[in-house]
Amino acid sequence: MSLNGVLGRALAPRESGFAAHQVGVDRLLASYRAIPIDANVRLAKKTSNLFRARAKSDAPGLDVSGLTGVIAVDADAKTADVAGMCTYEDLVAATLPYGLAPLVVPQLKTITLGGAVTGLGIESSSFRNGLPHESVLEIDVLTGAGEIVTATPTNEHAELFRGFPNSYGTLGYSTRLKIELESVPPFVALRHLRFNDVRELETTMDRIVAQRSHAGERVDYLDGVVFSATEAYLTLGRQTDEPGPVSDYTGMDIYYRSIQERETDRLTIHDYLWRWDTDWFWCSRAFGAQHPQIRRVWPKPLRRSSFYWKLIALDHRYGIADFIEARKGNPPRERVVQDIEVPIERTADFLDWFLREIPIEPIWLCPLRLRDPAPVPGPRPWPLYPLEPGRTYVNIGFWSSVPVQPGAPTGAANRAIEREVSALDGHKSLYSDAFYDADEFAALYGGEHYDALKRTYDPSSRLLDLYAKAVQRK
């Protein structure tokens, strides 16, 4: 455990310190002991970035209210000790004053560090920095047995360290994570490259990932947007400390539309990290927030993903969207909210299929490679999400709904996507609806390795099983 915040330095205003953190841990343990022995252990957490339904429980949950902050930042070592339920919004606010940031900052402000590690996260730095769990140095985990253990890549809990990513709280909950940070300058310069063919985009993206540059200029961030089969873009970001004018996409202007309108742009590093949050990528259009007249009166503090989540929750509770569709005489709609990864050489294949079969646009693209060298050894070092080191993948995100076809089985579009992803040697994140059968799920998400960890760290099955949670919605 880092001594930063304990010895040698006064805490910065956004750092809570280890003493306050221990109070939160003690409260967590007390809440664990208060949960009936025959009840599943869950978080008493009102917010979530998951898009899959789950069964309700009347049992009390884990009190994580004291585990929401940054414990301490060590600017010299470029590390931070962070509570598991700390949001990236708060984490970035604590590290940017030092000129530092997490190696990967997922796109939405209310994603927590613990959530990104146990459930995966990604962003435009992932082609050089991998996934959030790869910059974790050590992690304190409350296991299903009610014990807090510290897992590192080399200690007696190394297998838990490897198996924790993509376990979604079924092996335990993180209470503290020690993570690496990287230096960041104040600004990011952007280039938007247009492509009329997704195969040309695939080739260019692959070359940029390999060279980490384009047209003689360094590339620090890389993602893309597909608007149609004949209009797609890669956005190349370069860190810079050069002063100059910057754009603001928290007001009337909309970031994803700027990609179609400008070839170059500049943002502060803060606004770049949160460029997708203001309009929840493009999903704010579902609430009318992109209509100029509505946007003009929409309170600026409520142009953020966390508020749109509240609107989604209201819709789920009262079936507002389904009611409106029925009044229009339209069929019900199937939610298709997914992030998948395919090898980069299969990107165009998947996009061709998707644009032909699933009427959703735009589509987000984000290349990634596991870090080299990997923090843990093995041909597939993270067994619950077994991507291969040395291989480039592309995360493809799409978040909307499609009309239900007459006579189609439940989840027909999502099932078709799962089949196509598997056929292309890809993987699918588990934050949303999944329809795999038990055998296929085990083959894709850890199988025997997961079962062994479950027996060790949750021997009484106090926590839900991953298949029960991700597919059976328990």
Which stretches of residues belong to each language-model region?
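Noncatalytic alpha-helical scaffold of FAD-dependent oxidoreductases
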Residues: 1-474
